[in-house]
Amino acid sequence: MEKHYGSGDGKGQRILNPVTEVYMEEGSSMEMEMEQIKGVDSTDRQTIAELKGDARLVVKERLMTHGTQTAVSGYQVNLNGAGATADVVSRSVARDDSSQTFNARITGNAPCSGHTECDSIIMDNGHILAIPSLEANNVDAMLVHEAAIGKIAGDQLIKLMTLGLTEQQAEEQIINGFLR
């Protein structure tokens, strides 16, 4: 398991630009978790993965930006062997004037299956760009992408506020649950 974690109050220049390359042999498996909850002013995470037959890759990303922070997440997954599978999932929240880009590309070069998903909550003056991309080079490559960007639903806030939470507390509860 690989985990990138950034936290803090967002003051100063905190920059995180990791590049991860993964080469998976037949029958191998790997799970990666990336978690960044505020605290990093600028990040550009790039991940490249090459999977041979029956290899399994799971990537889970949880991201929250605020202030003027920027975050770029790039994933290039090549499913090169029969039975290779990949699941790349991102959940993110952009607050204040922050900006996020999620760019996930899955290429199926063999009978394989791949899935990428990006679910985001946008708040204030945030900016989110989701770029899910699929390429099939084999008739038996089964590839799926999903992307959704939206705001917190008013009825969710009202429900929590009727239980005694302030609007800010209700927003935090919703965000914390979403990023789990």
Regions inferred by a protein language model and the residue ranges of each:
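Conserved beta-strand/loop scaffold segments within soluble protein domains that form the structured core
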Residues: 1-158, 162-165, 175-180
